[in-house]
Amino acid sequence: MSDVKPPQHFTMNGNPPPPEFKNPKKPGRLTNHLQYIEKVVIRALWKHHFSWPFRQPVDAVRLNLPDYYTIIKNPMDLTTIRKRLENNYYWKAMECVEDFNTMFTNCYVYNRPGDDIVLMAQVLEKLFLEKVAEMPEEEYEISALTTKGPVKGARKSTIGLKKRPPSPMSEVVFQQTVTVIPPDALHTIPSAPLSAQLTAKLKNGVKRKADTTTPSASSIPSCESSSCVTEPKVLKLFSRRGSGRPIKPPCKDLPESPPQHQVGRRTKLSERLKYCNAILKEMFSKKHSAYAWPFYKPVDAETLGLLDYHEIIHQPMDMSTIKKKMEAREYTDALQFAADMRLMFSNCYKYNPPGHEVVSMARKLQDVFEFRFSKIPDEPKNANPVSSHNRVKKERARSPSSSESSDSESSSPENSSDTEEEDEEERAHRLASLEEQQLKAVREQLQLLTQTPLSKILKRSSSSKSSGCKVCTMMNSLKKPKFNSVLRRKESRACDSEEEMNTLPMSYEEKRQLSLDINKLPGDKLGKVVNIIKAREPLLRDTDPEEIEIDFETLKPSTLRALECYVVGCLRKKKNKPPKKSKIKEKDKDLQHATGEQNSHKKTKIETDGEIKDTTHPSRLSDSSSSSSSSDSSSSDSSSSDSCDSDSGLTEQKTKRKQSKGPGHANKIKKKKYYPVVPLPEQALRQANAEVKDSSSASGVMCQSRPSSLVSETGSKDLFASQHAKHPVEDITAITGIPPLLSPLTSPSAAMPATGSQSTSSSQFEASSPLCLYKDIVLKHADSWTSLGKLATQTPCTIKSSKESFQQFRKVAMEKELTTASRGLVSKHCLTQQPQKAKLECQPSKPEVESAELPLMAAILDTPKAPEPSSVLQNSVDREREMARKREQERRRREAMSGVIDMTMQRDIMATFEKNLE
């Protein structure tokens, strides 16, 4: 329900007449309190934006509130109170205050606690109580020009009150002021009950809304301050409304009068005190008045009925007293000002319970003060604070009124001065102890700040020492003595002690070398460099890591030394890692080639001895085949071995890698003593003619040397698997070189010399033709063998397994075919040139995919070389027919096998591509 009171004429049906505001039978008068309520309180409430529901009486008919006047027996509104004040309806101010309380109580009784109208009433009531607290302490009648005439008997009862000047306002602060009362004021005893009744009424109003959420008058009896309006403003108001001329009160009634004589002798405030004065002005501003008003004035314990206040609080303090001391230049340091402010808050916390409203207000105000005071500028070094002894003397020389205001329990001037001296000495001692504590805290913080970087530097130096020593021991085992001396110099420079790092500056050459070394670092190491610089340089801690610029001239020597130690360690690790990898690669390659060599020895053991194999195997390789085999190995090892050679600087490793690029790379470790240089093609031919007994063994050796130097690891595994076949044609398959079946497709020219070898009648041509074959292949199609090495390294194990299964299937088929073919083949000496010409004529017309398999079929057709020359002789016609039949059969077989091989390779290539995409 709302309590809205729109403007209305009091002639409506259903609404009772408004309360009376003029009663001739009831005597009334005009007092200073009533005048203050009319001119200050009513105006303030009327201007408030929440006052519109309370300006007129409640229109129950319009608002559809039929039970309003049944519940509310005594309605009241601001218009009625205003008219009563204008017509001198009230005899004293307490009657008007009761009307205000009735208006607010009616709102609380009729409406629910959470309604908007209730919250508006609470805000207005708080404003009303603040204004009433600023009202003068004693009430007396004044002559009003607007009134028709004084009421009978009023002059007799207010003769003494008329001559009385306005007394100081009732103030709720920490410090009680002793006011000098003139002799004629002793007859004004009836004014004291009025103050007591006003206080009691305020307390009653507080109890009524103690459960509300907004601050109320409950804070007044135990609060630490009261008003925002200063005393000169009220005096000016009284002089303006009383008579036509201002009233000058006696100087003895104004406690501010003694310090006024010192205005001409004021000294200039320091920067810190100016900042404190600004803080004080801000706390007096309207911005903080909602929770700072209880601390504006000293606590009036007698008026508020706080009889035990001065028994608990021995040193009261308030913001007005602090302001007076600031204006009187009694503060020589900002710490004294802060001590008084904190004393004021501590008194509030000490006297009031923790859950009291004024305690929460004090906490809010103290938070504001501490936040502002923490930003106070630093004190200059040449500023010397005044000694506490001189400060105590200055405090003693103050006016009697200010000394009396600091001691509320004194009954005589002597006791007051003694207590004040003790308080000042205690305060000076407390300030000295606070200064010592602050200095001690600052000292501890400085020690922590200085010790933390040192501990971090020591940890980094110890870690760099250990890592540097490990790197040094590893490098000593690899480098030459001359290089070791350079390493020792760098290591001694990197492992210097912390004292040397801090004191030893870095020369220009060292800075230039450090800059070059930092540029050599990889990208992942540069982040650590930035972290080292930020940890040691306070000015660079807030910079962006992506846009940081390093100037070595501005960095500290310790930072440069730490960077040097870190960079040297990183570069050493970078140099040590590549040789290890190259060694491992070389060992793996040696083992692989040695295994392939042993397998080749086992396969060819039937034809020749092991010793002859070891001595003739490398010598039968031509210079062209060595260049073809080196093309694959050099392409795969150039990226790693070249970089390692340039970094390590070891001549032994360079020579080893150069030798590894030759044709005997597979068995260079075992046979380096006997064959340091690869023989020329002519020497290979001589050794072949001298040691090999027949052409079949020579061709078998050549076919075997080819896969050992050109085919990858897959070919060696297939060779090893093929030697276990228990078939009579085992020697033939080993000699003809089955592993080339897994080699990539080659050009048609690769098979032409091999086919021609069948029709040769001399063994010399048979021995020399394979050499020419390999020479032509190397010179014309070296790129195909390079792609073979790349393909072998890229294919996964799944492709190898599929090749192995296909190889086994092919081997069985080939063995079966060769067994049937060997029965009807004739010797090589009786072959004519006609089949050779026919073969050469039909080969260029075949497609490229079909001709790519000619080397494989050539190896199959070389099988007649395996049987002994003393085979069964047949007629020439039968031989020609058999050869023609064989050609046609092989052609058809080639066509079928070429399609199968293409499909398999295509499938394997697609599978590899999909895996790489994943």
From Swiss-Prot:
Family matches, as SMART domains: BROMO
Subcellular location: Nucleus
Encoding gene, per UniProt annotation: brdt
CDD domains hit by this protein: Bromo_Brdt_I_like, Bromo_Brdt_II_like
Low complexity bias (residue ranges): 399-416, 622-648, 739-764
Record note on domains: Bromo domains mediate interaction with histones that have acetylated lysine residues at specific positions. Bromo domain 1 mediates binding with histone H4 acetylated at 'Lys-5' and 'Lys-8' (H4K5ac and H4K8ac, respectively). The bromo domains also recognize and bind a subset of butyrylated histones: able to bind histone H4 butyrylated at 'Lys-8' (H4K8ac), while it is not able to bind H4 butyrylated at 'Lys-5' (H4K5ac).
UniProt entry keywords in alphabetical sequence: Activator, Bromodomain, Chromatin regulator, Coiled coil, Differentiation, Meiosis, Nucleus, Repeat, Spermatogenesis, Transcription, Transcription regulation
A Pfam family annotated for this UniProt entry: Bromodomain
Chain location of the short sequence motif Nuclear localization signal per the record: 204-215
Annotated organism of origin: Danio rerio (Zebrafish)
One GO location term (cellular component): nucleus
Function as written in the Swiss-Prot or TrEMBL entry: Testis-specific chromatin protein that specifically binds histone H4 acetylated at 'Lys-5' and 'Lys-8' (H4K5ac and H4K8ac, respectively) and plays a key role in spermatogenesis. Required in late pachytene spermatocytes: plays a role in meiotic and post-meiotic cells by binding to acetylated histones at the promoter of specific meiotic and post-meiotic genes, facilitating their activation at the appropriate time. In the post-meiotic phase of spermatogenesis, binds to hyperacetylated histones and participates in their general removal from DNA.
Protein name: Bromodomain testis-specific protein
Gene3D superfamilies xref list: 1.20.1270.220, Bromodomain-like
Basic residues: bias regions: 575-584
Domain NET: 496-578
